[in-house]
Amino acid sequence: RDFRNLALTELAHTVCELLDWRRPQGGLKSRECYQFLQSLQQRGWLPWLPTAKPHARRPHQTVVSAESDPQLPCTGDLRQWLPVEVQQITERRERQLFQQYLHRYHYLGYRVPYGAQLRYFIRGGRAPARILGCLLFTSAAWKMAPRDGYIGWDESARSGGLTHIVNNSRFLILPWVHIPNLASHVLSLGAKAVERDWPVHYGAEAVLLETLVDRSHYAGTCYRAANWVALGRTTGRGK
């Protein structure tokens, strides 16, 4: 009640400061705290604040351009397309094209990622290398029973260890690309890229990768070929 005059944003900052809830690089986890407090507010569990009415967020609008139109087929043996590289995306124009590709060609579409994230283009062939697909890595799911059982940690250990787990939330080989064994090769390259880049951007070593495979669409064959381990089924993904 001492903080009843604070706006929700200010309250989130204050809670993070009092609990010393920080990212590995030292910044406060204010966004995560705000989202949590907002969910409590909507349930009426913060009685000193007005009950927030859920409102529909304006969906992210992806502007589609001809740049993401289907291209000439990429076919042949993987050796013909070496070296294949995963190139981190840092420029605005590249981010926009990345969003377009996922929006148009990934069955889940594109959503603005929440929290930590790394984007990569998959490029292959001799110069100029062609874009063959996209990889998106984000912060880990808050709870996932098969994963948590595999690791064997409790609530406290999970809370401290999640910064070392990275989720492969999107993996797209563009529909005009038909190169056998490309997907598993890319997953191996992606794992090395995350191991290199995650500590640079977020100050935490990436020690485990996770993903969810929709069995109604895919069998997860490329993940198994890249030495990923199937842990079981889950009912959903939550932060």
Residue ranges and their predicted role:
Residues 6, 17-39, 85-239:
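Acyl-donor binding region in acyl/amide transferases
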